[in-house]
Amino acid sequence: MILKNFIVFEGIDGAGTSTQIEILKKRDDADRFFFTTEPTDSETGKFLRKMLKGDVELDPRTSAFLFAADRNEHLYGTGGTNCGVVAKAESGKIVVSDRYLFSSLTYQSVTCGDELPRRLNESF
């Protein structure tokens, strides 16, 4: 999917993606932007954050499915304050996301191979 007004900061842990987004938030014209993250703050995203902190243990394939579900909510849903990216971008907001598709493809490929993450995310 190609989405106008959608900018993603990707990078390994500690690469500075969040730092760059914080710099953007301090701009005078920051109201033109809609800032978001993956995992989202939807219920699925909150569960994924617990998993990432080690509070919940899941099979890697299960987590791959949940990340794809959270990405769908991120793009189209209304289940969190940072969801509904497509609607925000189409309304003229510049959407800036801290992580997106390539993070899933990279991290999940390590734990469950290339094929499943690629198939789950091919529509994104």
Residues covered by each model-derived region:
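Hydrophobic residues on the short alpha-helix immediately C-terminal to a glycine-rich phosphate/catalytic loop
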Residues: 24-27, 51
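Conserved lysine of the Walker
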Residues: 17
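The conserved Walker
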Residues: 13
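Phosphate-binding P-loop
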Residues: 1-4
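ATP-dependent small-molecule kinase phosphotransfer cores
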Residues: 31-122
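Hydrophobic anchor at the beta1->P-loop junction of P-loop NTPases
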Residues: 9
